[in-house]
Amino acid sequence: MDHKMFCFQCEQTAGCAGCTGKAGVCGKTTEVAELQDQLTGALVGLSRAVDNAPDTNEGTWRLMIEGLFATVTNVSFNEKTIRELIDRVHEERARLIPNCSGCPSSCGRNDDYDMAQLWTAQEDIRSLKSLILFGARGMAAYAYHAMMLGYADEEVNRFFAKALFAVGEDWDMDALLPIVMEVGEKNLKCMALLDKANTESYGTPTPVTVPLTVEKGPFIVITGHDLHDLKLLLEQTAGKGVNIYTHGEMLPAHGYPELKKYAHLKGNFGTAWQNQQKEFADIPAPVLFTTNCLMPPKASYADRVFTTAVVSYPELTHIGEDKDFTPVIEKALALGGYNEDKPFTGINGGGTVMTGFGHGAVLGAADQVIEAVKSGAIRHFFLVGGCGGARPGRNYYTEFVKQTPADTVVLTLACGKFRFNDLELGTIGGLPRLMDVGQCNDAYGAVKIALALADAFGCGVNDLPLSLVLSWYEQKAVCILLTLLHLGIRNIRLGPTLPAFISPNVLNYLAENFHIAPVTTPEEDLKVLLKR
């Protein structure tokens, strides 16, 4: 490889082919990209050690999960923290196989893997291994959040080692394809684990209207996915005159009873991650990043950005494992917030949004939904969700939702919803036509809803009047897509572009076996999907 870097794991990769210049489209430098490859290679080496040694423990799995999560797009831009992770991985490998370093044989069985071997592999092998690796990275984010709440699953943990091991082996397509599908299977189990962790910790989400107006006075904006960090921040700010506003994927937190009981959790600020450099530029408040998606902050507001957990960026203030958010709170008090209430709107001008329509809430109204379908009030369901992003063409999803007929229901999730979640679509059968199921990991909830409807109507999921129209950006979308394929769900529309790491042969396999297809135009796709 004669280029400076190679990365094609996100939807915005350069030229829909791969970032190969001095920096990635996401903003990471060539040095960070190289270190992420080194970290991944070290994790493959660790998986080899796990395969050869029985002495694994909770620390082994936490390190493997943390290392994978750190390589997800827009998580870590910090050379120092990635180097520290590499050192920790090497130390853990040495602990697992202490006799290996003194062995006179140089078998290389437990060595780090050279990622250049993957990037230069035959394109179909590279494609399948990329699906395994990127899917494992996305799944690691969910496992990490569950782990922070004290929930873990040995089968899920061991699969991370299995997936990494497969990346480093010289296996053919017949050996790799079952592991690709197993990513989807294990991610379903992992999302179920996180759903259990969240609901047992914070209660079952219920529908709630969330204001977009920011009240006067000091406030903190918290973004990302980690509900545990939000809970700790709410506890530490209670009674201090500092209000809390969610941003991006943190919006669904408002539906959880144990979070919304805090009176100073006031509302939601801003929209999806790709708009942060504009939205954060002038706010008189700090922003706390708990997970991706962090964009390189502009100098005008960098002193107000804080990171925690695996999120890291050079020279930003990082909140460590003690989770003492005092610096964030002090910054909020010093900045003071707005002098008077300041109204904001969503992308389409709406002043409020709704969330909290998780599987618990929707299935709680199952009789109402079933009756609406049987009576003809509801003709079709659409799941329009997934990642937000900056590539031109994503307004497709706004127009698609706007054009859905009045006798259809739109379920949504993840940050792609901000393109349309402030629209007023009215009600149907006593329910809102637009229902936010939650974060990207709440795809598990959408699956539960679909399976319950199929059971109620005595049919398969693919026989339901249900269509999936998905947007993707990073690696969590990869593992969710593989979960849907594992469940045998067909006729998915995916956009705004197809992954650069999917080779033509692998794409043909997906098209032939699952009828997955790229989005075209809202008008044409609606016409086709409503005929099903």
Where are these regions (language model features)?
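Electropositive, gly/pro-rich neighborhoods at or near active sites that engage anionic ligands
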Residues: L43-S201
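Anaerobic metallocofactor- and corrinoid-dependent redox/one-carbon enzyme cores
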Residues: D2-V32, Q36, G41-G45, P178, ...
